[in-house]
Amino acid sequence: MSHRKFSAPRHGHMGFTPKKRSRTYRGRIKAFPKDDKSKPIHLTAFLGYKAGMTHIVRDVDKPGSKVNKKEVVEAVTIVETPPMVIAGVTGYVDTPQGPRALTTIWAEHLSEEARRRFYSNWAKSKKKAFTKYAKKWQDEDGKKLIEADFAKLKKYCSSIRVIAHTQMKILRRRQKKAHLVEIQVNGGTIEQKVDWAREHLEKQVQVDTVFAQDEMIDTIGVTRGHGFKGVTSRWHTKKLPRKTHKGLRKVACIGAWHPSRVAFTVARAGQKGFHHRTIINNKIYRIGKSALTEEGKNNGSTEFDLTQKTITPMGGFPRYGIVNQDYIMLRGAVLGPKKRLITLRKSLITQTKRVAHEKINLKWIDTSSKTGHGRFQTTAEKRAFMGKLKRDFLAEAEAKA
């Protein structure tokens, strides 16, 4: 910064270093919301799959704002959240080194998609996972051990978590291996939490029992990967003048002669994207039911738009397909590409801003094709506008013949 009368802040935030690839593509929950015994028992997280984006029209409810009671168009992200199955329960004990797992109790019956997670090659394996453990539930001595473990959880543990897995068989994805996650149980006493977890073993949990409409939540996941990138793309450093020797998209000075090494604070080329990130304060605009049920067959309609349609746009979401299961509509963008596993977690902070408490009333949801400039909202609307096509006349001719 020699010979300058002003300062130039560094380019790029050091709070996210090192910028390296995430170890896994599933968002890891490193902290859970603070427990409150006065509240009813509930789970604090859920897993979903990013389907794509669309836009909505709604009325703003902000007294005193210039856009109060006016229509606004906002981008939203659809995250498909099929029901999860609780496969086990584990308890944690507080120690000077932090929480430590005391014991884990698994359900008697684990689905094949959950057991696949414990093998790198399911086809060549003996498929013996949990076969010996399942006999505990049938043997008298084994039942005594399980009862002792449940009693141990109630006596010593300070926090209870359930082990839940997704259901890939109802997602219509190529992957058969389920995703497992530990979810902390909040509310009530330790004894009530253990009893609740035991009652829900091998049972499904819906997303609407975890989150609510208009709630602010956190999304945890791995961002879209971009591979090896240069310093200008990776750190957004200023390009050098046109006549610079040996390249413009570089850092002119990477440090002094001594110390004779490059400091870690100097912007360098390397990996960009596929980083583990947590995005806080994503507002839930809607929790939709499965399109395969009677309640959710028109889960893309609103009180103002009575058109019978689902949330899936015409032609499906690009690079994802059809959303048939329960879904969550979040305001704005969500990290990661299509099909990326997204961890949804209850907010860690107490929401005090007016935006967090605003009631959302959707007036219209766009379901036009996302592969171009969509003109029609439903196939029926397109058919009514276009009239009979050549294939329709040919089909009628074949039927008469």
UniProtKB/Swiss-Prot annotation:
Q: Which family does it belong to?
A: Belongs to the universal ribosomal protein uL3 family.
Q: Which InterPro entries match?
A: L3_arc_euk, Ribosomal_L3_dom_3_arc_sf, Ribosomal_uL3, Ribosomal_uL3_CS, Transl_B-barrel_sf
Q: Record's superkingdom?
A: Eukaryota
Q: State the Gene Ontology terms under molecular function.
A: RNA binding; structural constituent of ribosome
Subcellular localization, per the record? Cytoplasm
The beginning of the lineage is: Eukaryota, Metazoa, Ecdysozoa, Nematoda, Chromadorea
Gene name linked to the record: rpl-3
Would you tell me the Gene Ontology cellular component terms? cytosolic large ribosomal subunit
Q: What does this protein do?
A: The L3 protein is a component of the large subunit of cytoplasmic ribosomes.
Protein's name in the database: Large ribosomal subunit protein uL3
BP terms from Gene Ontology: translation
Query: Is Cytoplasm one of the keywords UniProt gives this record?
Result: yes
Q: Which organism is it from?
A: Caenorhabditis elegans
Its keywords, alphabetically, are: Cytoplasm, Ribonucleoprotein, Ribosomal protein
Under Pfam families, the record lists: Ribosomal_L3
Where in this protein does the record put region Disordered?
1-22
